[in-house]
Amino acid sequence: MAVPGPTARAGARPRLDLQLVQRFVRIQKVFFPSWSSQNVLMFMTLLCVTLLEQLVIYQVGLIPSQYYGVLGNKDLDGFKALTLLAVTLIVLNSTLKSFDQFTCNLLYVSWRKDLTEHLHHLYFRARVYYTLNVLRDDIDNPDQRISQDVERFCRQLSSVTSKLIISPFTLTYYTYQCFQSTGWLGPVSIFGYFIVGTMVNKTLMGPIVTKLVQQEKLEGDFRFKHMQIRVNAEPAAFYRAGLVEHMRTDRRLQRLLQTQRELMSRELWLYIGINTFDYLGSILSYVVIAIPIFSGVYGDLSPTELSTLVSKNAFVCIYLISCFTQLIDLSTTLSDVAGYTHRIGELQEALLDMSRKSQDCEALGESEWDLDKTPGCPTTEPSDTAFLLDRVSILAPSSDKPLIKDLSLKICEGQSLLITGNTGTGKTSLLRVLGGLWEGMKGSVQMLADFGPHGVLFLPQKPFFTDGTLREQVIYPLKEIYPDSGSADDERIVRFLELAGLSSLVARTGGLDQQVDWNWYDVLSPGEMQRLSFARLFYLQPKYAVLDEATSALTEEAESELYRIGQQLGMTFISVGHRPSLEKFHSWVLRLHGGGSWELTRIKLE
């Protein structure tokens, strides 16, 4: 096989199972890499704040029973002191609750940062992003999973964190208090009530997780459709394709909305279960209190003392039930968290797997050249051979159809190669193999020169421009960013822009370092984009330039001028093209005839 073919999209249905737990734990390792990490410190701070908050809440909860006492005894001084205490506790509780929410928000930001950067590290390693987006189809919308799903996952998880971490402490304490007030009957009844509620809600949550994963996939597909129209607005306009694209976009919208309706229908039953257990809990608390009262346990108390006791015991039982119902109420949020856990975990597993495979060829990966250095002296001894191919065969992806069979080739310095052939004969496929994006079915491919300045540089068929200034487009993919005041490299960049026929572009952009708010693809014509790619090529000055129809939008005169400048800069070309005018800049021509056959001949210049 030339490349790993697209994997069938047939994964197991996302469920509340061991796989979910494993994926969740793997994500938590990203959040909490060590005991000394910042997130652990914030988590422990949140735990302390919530513990203090619960202590204050307990004292606030006892205030009503104390009011019964002072009002029943008509104690004015006690009433004033109790009111002052109540106001103080309420202000303290409000402050602690605000710090609770603030810390949760900080955790959300920190978690999102750590998880996104972790996925970015895996996604941009070697050419994982290419494999995931082009050669595999089992992971839908990786961009949505990294940008949107991670955000929602971290926000939802942070919103329930304080409730989850305090639950073991509150449940233990209020269970003990409930036992002291009602005996074993109260805790047993409440725990049994919670177990039943948990089992019912787990049954109701299962279908929601599956449907949520499906909804997020369709959300990504719908967003991608709009992005497709945005990127290709001009071709669509030339085709007068508004009506058909309207229909296709609405079709994706209807699929999304239908899934959302199904999700809401399943959530309806979960909401019914949650609300039912909420209201039943309030009745259960009084049933638990009533049993010892009617059985005569408190028969020796006066009405005022009994009211005080009932108020205190009611608070304890109601709060214990409230702790359980809060956990049940989190079912909807936790089902969302489970759905996002599956989507993010699935992506993380795929990225980790591909990253491990890429480590074996890391020396041939993105570390091939220093992205931080400007063009200068090569760090290794220059090689007079760029590529060495020995009996290489290439297949089309997911096909047994051979594109090229048993190709042996040596591309040396000063011996430029022109690759020609009809559409579909494997010209670009050969460049993908040379660049390491694809693997040959058999044979060996060696790249003996480094990537980058004084090595090999590829100009793909579709020009690529990132966001940023004009300078950043020219020096791309070098990472060094110059100050706004300019640099010693300004003259070189301007000169290469002039040589590429883009002398007016500096004025149009307002300078090399002027931030622009446009999309470069929207403001540059196809010819200008190819000229800007050549300005980048001139700036980086590789020894070998691999060009995939890099002048197809230019005239023959402009094409000849750009190739002539490249020759003057000492470049050896490996070009894909159709024009006979290209032959004078090359020493050899490789003609691909399709079906695997090819012909390599030396160009005889007149």
Curated annotation (Swiss-Prot):
Domain ABC transporter as annotated: residue spans: 389-603
EC numbers, comma separated: 7.6.2.8
Coiled coil: none
Major site of localization recorded for this protein: endoplasmic reticulum
Chain positions recorded as ATP binding sites: 421-428
GO MF: ABC-type vitamin B12 transporter activity; ATP binding; ATP hydrolysis activity; identical protein binding
Keyword terms of this UniProt record: ATP-binding, Endoplasmic reticulum, Lysosome, Membrane, Nucleotide-binding, Translocase, Transmembrane, Transmembrane helix, Transport
ABC transmembrane type-1 domain sequence ranges: 39-332
Catalytic activity: an R-cob(III)alamin(out) + ATP + H2O = an R-cob(III)alamin(in) + ADP + phosphate + H(+)
Domain of life: Eukaryota
GO terms (BP aspect): cellular response to leukemia inhibitory factor; cobalamin metabolic process; cobalamin transport
Assembly, per entry: Homodimer or heterodimer. Interacts with LMBRD1; this interaction induces the translocation of ABCD4 from the ER to the lysosome membrane. Interacts with LMBRD1 and MMACHC; this interaction ensures the transport of cobalamin from the lysosome to the cytosol.
Protein name: Lysosomal cobalamin transporter ABCD4
Organism, scientific name: Mus musculus (Mouse)
Lineage of the species this protein comes from: Eukaryota, Metazoa, Chordata, Craniata, Vertebrata
Gene behind the chain: Abcd4
